[in-house]
Amino acid sequence: MSQTNQVPKIGFVSLGCPKNLVDSERILTELRTEGYQVVPTYDDADLVIVNTCGFIDSAVQESLEAIGEALDENGKVIVTGCLGAKENQIREVHPKVLEITGPHSYEQVLSHIHHYVPKPSHNPFTSLVPEQGVKLTPRHYAYLKISEGCNHRCTFCIIPSMRGDLDSRPIGEVLNEAKRLVNAGVKELLVISQDTSAYGVDTKHQTGFWDGMPVKTSMVSLCEQLAKLGIWVRLHYVYPYPHVDEVIPLMAEGKILPYLDIPLQHASPKVLKLMKRPGSVERTLERVKRWREICPELTLRSTFIVGFPGETEEDFQMLLDFLTEARLDRVGCFKYSPVEGAKANELPDQVPEEVKEERYHRFMQLQQQISTERLQEKIGKVLPVIIDEVDEEGAIGRSMADAPEIDGAVYLNEQFDVEPGQIVRVLIEHADEYDLWGTIVEQ
C-alpha cells in the first residue's frame, strides 16, 4: 500500500476529571468519523493528543510529565484541555509542542490535526463509529455533560478562567444524547458539569423541545425526563441551591438514584466567606435532615478542603462538628494547596503544611468512623447492585450509593454467572469502612 493510502493513526492521552473524559470522547468520535485510526502506543501514532488537567498543582505536574513522555516517545504532540489555557507555562517546559488549545476547543484541535496529519481521502471507518460515539467508560455506564463553565468565583478555583462562564447545552440535545446512550446499552448515566444545579440559568431556563414536547431547560426538568428512560440516573457536582429540594421527591419515588454529590467545602462561616461559598451551616443541616425525611435511602457525598488560608483550630473544629452531626455517607478531603491564578493565594494567614497534614488525618479518621457506622447499617438489607466486572474471585459491583471510581464497591465472591451492566439484588452480609460484601438473592 502506498504512503498516501495509509490510514493516519492518532495516539491519545486523557487526564483529569470526568468532564475532561467527555471532551476526549467527543474528539475521538470526530477522529473516528473522519477515518483516523486511534492507536494505543506512541510508536504506532503519527501524532499524539494530550488532553490535560490544570486544576491543582499535582494535576499540572502530571500533565506536564505526560506531555514530556509523549514528546520523548513520539515527538509530534498537540496539547488541549484545561492546562492548555496556560500556553506560556507549557511552552516554557516543552517548547517543541506543535500546537496548544484550551478546554472544549474541539474544532481547533481537529483543525490542527488536519494540518499535521491530513484527513484520509477514503474513509473506511465511518460505518464502525457507534451511534453513541466513542466512549472511554465501560459499556454499561456513561457520563452525560450538560454544560460548560461556571458563574461562581470561588477563591480557590481557576475553572472559570479556563472554561469560562456557564454555558448550558440545549436540553433537547442533552436528552437526545441520553437516549442514544441508553439505546446502545448504557444502564447508568452520570450527569456532570461544573455546576449541575445551575443548568439553564444562563438561558433564563428557556423552553426547549424533545420528542416534539416543550421542556424547560433546568436541572429538575432534565431529571424528570431522564427518569423516563428506565435507567439509573446519578447527579454529580450539585451546588446547594434551594431548588435542589425539588429533586428529592423524584429520588424518593425511585425515578432517579437517591444520590447527591454536593461539594460543601467547609462548615465554618468565616472560611466559607473567604472561599466565596454560601455559608449557612445551620440551614445546610436543616436541609439534610429534611431530605432524609423525604428520602430515607438518600446517599450524600461531599468534598471538603482543610488548611485553607485563615482556617484556625476553632474553624476546623466546626468542620469536625458538622461531620459528626451531618453523618454524610461519602466524603472526599483535600489539603489546600495554592493554584496559580487563584485569588486564595493572596489571602493572609496561610496554614503551615504540618498543620494541614495533621488536620487532614483527624478529618479522615473521624469520617472513616462515620462511614463504617453508615455501612454497618446496610448489613442484612437487600440492595440493587449494578455489576461492573467479573474476575477470578467473583463479581464486583456498586450499589445505588456508589458512583464509579470515587465511591465504594460491593464484592460478590464466588459469583460468576453475571455480566457487566446487569442489575441484581444482593443481600449484604459484611461491611468495612468503605465497601460491602454480599450474596445474590433470587430476582
Curated annotation (Swiss-Prot):
Q: Which residues form the Radical SAM core domain?
A: 136-373
Its required cofactor(s), as named, are:
[4Fe-4S] cluster
- Which positions are annotated as binding [4Fe-4S] cluster 1? C17, C53, C82
Q: What is its main location?
A: cytoplasm
**Which GO molecular function entries does the Swiss-Prot or TrEMBL record give?**
4 iron, 4 sulfur cluster binding; aspartic acid methylthiotransferase activity; metal ion binding; protein methylthiotransferase activity
Which EC numbers does the record give? Answer: 2.8.4.4
Give the reactions, separated by semicolons, that this protein catalyses: L-aspartate(89)-[ribosomal protein uS12]-hydrogen + (sulfur carrier)-SH + AH2 + 2 S-adenosyl-L-methionine = 3-methylsulfanyl-L-aspartate(89)-[ribosomal protein uS12]-hydrogen + (sulfur carrier)-H + 5'-deoxyadenosine + L-methionine + A + S-adenosyl-L-homocysteine + 2 H(+)
The cross-references to Pfam families, in alphabetical order and at most eight, read: Radical_SAM (PF04055), TRAM_2 (PF18693), UPF0004 (PF00919)
Keyword Transport on this protein? no
Location within or outside the cell: Cytoplasm
Tell me which UniProt keywords the record has, alphabetically: 4Fe-4S, Cytoplasm, Iron, Iron-sulfur, Metal-binding, S-adenosyl-L-methionine, Transferase
A Gene Ontology CC term for this entry? Answer: cytosol
The TRAM domain covers 376-442
SMART domains with a match to the protein in the record: Elp3
* Biological process, per Gene Ontology: tRNA modification
Query: Where does the MTTase N-terminal domain start and stop, copy by copy?
Result: 8-118
Q: Where exactly are the transmembrane stretches of this chain?
A: none
Q: Which residues bind [4Fe-4S] cluster 2?
A: C150, C154, C157
Q: What CDD domains does the record tag this protein with?
A: Radical_SAM
Cite the cofactor comment: Binds 2 [4Fe-4S] clusters. One cluster is coordinated with 3 cysteines and an exchangeable S-adenosyl-L-methionine.
Family per similarity comment: Belongs to the methylthiotransferase family. RimO subfamily.
User: What HAMAP family does the record tag this protein with?
Assistant: MTTase_RimO
Functional summary from the UniProt entry:
Catalyzes the methylthiolation of an aspartic acid residue of ribosomal protein uS12.
Designated name of the protein: Ribosomal protein uS12 methylthiotransferase RimO
Q: Can you name the source organism?
A: Proteus mirabilis (strain HI4320)
Gene that this polypeptide is encoded by:
rimO
